[in-house]
Amino acid sequence: MAKRIVTRIGDIFCVELGDGYKSYFQYIANDMTQLNSSVIRAFVGRYPMDYQPDMDELVKSEVAFYAHTVLRIGLVGDHWYKVGKSKDLGLDELASAWFVGESSTVYNPETDKFDDVDPLEHFYVWHCNESQIPIGKMTPEISESPMTTNGSVLSWFRIVERIKYGYTSADLYLNRYVKQKPWPWVESYLTYFDRMARLRYYFHFKGEKISREVIRTSDGNFINLSENDPEKDGYALFTGSFGDISWCAWNVTGEKFNTIWDKHHGKES
């Protein structure tokens, strides 16, 4: 017989990061506005595997993000596990968090059909357990709020991904306005193809800052750029932060990036 899984508001869970560290999140509410899904708050910080937290002290930590998820799936798959509980839910802070969604279709009463629309012009927002508010285009009030986040019900994979890296690899419309920020210790590798310029970019970030970049030109040459060698043959190292390009880039492995870098290091045109 399958083990009965019981979760209660206040429960605290641990996510093992796979690099000798672990992090924590707490189940703090159910959101009737979003399918009565579980709302969690993930805490800033990673801890050695032998660390034994004081739960009442842990919940006083800075909140990294809020999210909706299905706790049971993560528990059944051993993606997180319960380690304790606390009555401190931080609900005053949750009340100020904005959840964001967007619509790609809207109902047209004249035709009794749904019309396709631009999601970038049809955002809606809400606070936990409050009505959704259509806002049209994204506004500074929402995008610049410190706790604005994707309001979808996230899979266990997306929850763990964001806890581990500080961001998710999902391509979200929201990311055009709310920049993703990796943890300072995270190394990220991304690639992006500029169809207009016919240039393929490969990026290596340390935290939010660019470390290395490889550009494949339209004629098949490769340009290696770095902090120590930021300009070459009319090309310059990317000067923005991670969040400036993460919404339109695909992840690649560090192994693939380094293979490309090493293959063309010192051989640029």
Where are these regions (language model features)?
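Short beta-strand segments
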Residues: 23-25, 212, 250
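Broad, structure-driven detector of short, well-ordered beta-strand segments within folded domains
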Residues: 25-26, 197-206, 214
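Negatively charged, low-complexity tracts enriched in Asp/Glu with abundant Ser/Thr
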Residues: 174-200
